């Protein structure tokens, strides 16, 4: 046994089944009115009954306004209704859309019988319905030349799609000749083969006035058409068999014209929107370009070109001066560095030696002068000068030797060397070298 369901869920399920039943969406019900009451809102509530059953019915004010008689209790009527359920009470009731006094019941019976037959034959199936063309070039109209339907359709087409051509087939839309003329016009439109979509219809009326569009000859012509057909018969509450067989049903002739040009109108609006956007974009670009040109025209440079050239020359002269000053400053710095490097060799110690030797020479010269003859003194002086020259740093350098200085101090042996750069003094200049390895004696090697 399935799980129990709440009452509201059962009611919703039953209502959904009723609403989904195509036959119950619009059915003509014959019965006698009882308990009729019209409220101030305009809505009418009553019961339809026969000898065996009764059903609650409601007719809303928008439909009640179309009544051509005043309903009363005991009156026998035919009510075109939708069968549904009122969820609050769970009552199955009729939503009456159209109601007429009985007397034309045979027409409704024929209508309902033929409707069931066509539905069983599949003539109402959505699968067989043809789609409307997106951009029709020619629209065919089958209607009366005297009614308002033609004016409404043509006016709407010209307003929404003025480039679309119209082919009009004038026919009678009620009376004995209406059905054969409408069917013949539909076939003629198909023989032309230049129409992209057909609108078949007329304005509203009674069931007798609309009956031509329930006749088999018209229904069969619509079914056989290779051109998509929009049925626009009567008002929104009027339904004919032509409406069910046609590819699309329109509530009014004006609505039919709108459906025929729906995509055209949408594309037109898109084009207008894009055109406005493009216009705004172009105007914005033009305004920006105009402003830029005006700024250039009003700039001081264009108004006074001599002043602009003078400014350029002044900036060039300043750049030239800065370049010359920079070169001089660089040359001064280089000269100073060169002097510092040339003075890095430590000659103070040799200067002291030379001074001491000079004093000794002078002393010896004085002694020789006093104690020896001049020739012997001269010889000794020459010998001393030779010895002095032998120990002179310049003499050492002239024989191919060099002096090494590191961090401003004279290097006398390998162990004094440290990692980094050293200055090597030659007879004719100096060089900078990097100490990478120390070798003490013949065997000991020290990596820096």
Curated annotation (Swiss-Prot):
Question: This chain belongs to which protein, by name?
Answer: Exodeoxyribonuclease 7 large subunit
Catalytic activity from the UniProt record = Exonucleolytic cleavage in either 5'- to 3'- or 3'- to 5'-direction to yield nucleoside 5'-phosphates
From the Swiss-Prot or TrEMBL record, state where the protein is found. Cytoplasm
Q: Which Gene Ontology cellular component terms are annotated?
A: cytoplasm; exodeoxyribonuclease VII complex
Enumerate the HAMAP family for this protein: Exonuc_7_L (MF_00378)
EC number in record: 3.1.11.6
The annotated subunit structure for this chain is: Heterooligomer composed of large and small subunits.
Q: Which PANTHER family match?
A: EXODEOXYRIBONUCLEASE 7 LARGE SUBUNIT
Primary place of residence? cytoplasm
> What UniProt keywords apply to this chain's record, in alphabetical order?
Cytoplasm, Exonuclease, Hydrolase, Nuclease
Check the record and name the InterPro entries matching this protein: Exonuc_VII_L, Exonuc_VII_lsu_C, OB-fold_nuc-bd_dom
Q: Which GO terms describe its molecular function?
A: exodeoxyribonuclease VII activity; nucleic acid binding
Species of origin: Exiguobacterium sp. (strain ATCC BAA-1283 / AT1b)
Q: What is the lineage of its organism?
A: Bacteria, Bacillati, Bacillota, Bacilli, Bacillales
Q: Which GO terms describe its biological process?
A: DNA catabolic process
Protein task: Bidirectionally degrades single-stranded DNA into large acid-insoluble oligonucleotides, which are then degraded further into small acid-soluble oligonucleotides.
The family annotation for this protein states: Belongs to the XseA family.
């Amino acid at each position: 046994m399935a799980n129990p369901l709440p009452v509201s869920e059962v009611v919703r399920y039953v209502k959904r089944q009723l609403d989904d039943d195509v036959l119950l969406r619009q059915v003509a019900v014959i019965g006698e009115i009882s308990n009729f009451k019209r409220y101030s809102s305009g809505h009418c509530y009553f019961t339809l009954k026969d000898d065996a059953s009764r059903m609650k019915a409601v007719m809303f004010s928008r439909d009640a306004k179309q009544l051509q008689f005043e309903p009363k209790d005991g009156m026998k009527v035919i009510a075109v209704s939708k069968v549904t359920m009122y969820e609050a009470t769970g009552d199955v009731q009729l939503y009456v859309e159209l109601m007429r006094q009985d007397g034309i019941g045979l027409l409704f019976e024929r209508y309902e019988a033929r409707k069931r037959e066509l539905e069983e034959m599949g003539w109402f199936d959505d699968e067989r319905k043809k789609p409307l063309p997106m951009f029709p070039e020619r629209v065919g109209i089958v209607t009366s030349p005297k009614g308002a339907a033609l004016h409404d359709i043509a006016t709407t087409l010209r307003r929404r799609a003025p480039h679309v051509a119209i082919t009009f087939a004038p026919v009678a839309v009620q009376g004995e000749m209406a059905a054969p003329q409408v069917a013949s016009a539909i076939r003629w439109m198909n023989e032309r083969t230049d129409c992209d979509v057909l609108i078949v219809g007329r304005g509203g009326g009674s069931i007798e006035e609309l009956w031509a569009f329930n006749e088999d000859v018209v229904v069969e012509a619509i079914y056989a058409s290779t051109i998509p057909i929009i049925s626009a018969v009567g008002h929104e509450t009027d339904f004919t068999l032509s409406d069910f067989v046609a590819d699309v049903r329109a509530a009014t002739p004006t609505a039919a014209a709108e459906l025929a040009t729906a995509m055209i109108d949408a594309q037109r609006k898109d084009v207008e929107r894009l055109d406005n956007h493009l216009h705004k974009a172009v105007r914005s670009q033009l305004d920006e370009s105009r402003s830029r040109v005006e700024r250039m025209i009003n700039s001081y440079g264009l108004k006074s070109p001599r002043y602009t050239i003078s400014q350029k020359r002044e900036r060039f002269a300043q750049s030239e001066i800065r370049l010359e000053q920079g070169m001089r400053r660089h040359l001064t710095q280089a000269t100073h560095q060169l002097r510092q490097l040339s003075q890095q060799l430590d000659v103070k110690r040799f200067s002291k030696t030379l001074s001491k030797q000079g004093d000794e020479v002078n002393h010896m010269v004085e002694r020789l002068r006093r104690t020896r003859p001049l020739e012997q003194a001269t010889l000794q002086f020459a010998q001393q000068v030779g010895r002095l020259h032998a120990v002179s740093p310049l003499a050492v350098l002239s024989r191919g030797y060099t002096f090494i200085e590191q961090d401003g101090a004279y290097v006398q042996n390998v162990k004094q060397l440290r990692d980094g750069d050293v200055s090597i003094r030659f007879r004719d200049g100096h060089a900078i070298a990097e100490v990478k390895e120390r070798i003490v004696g013949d065997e000991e090697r020290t990596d820096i």
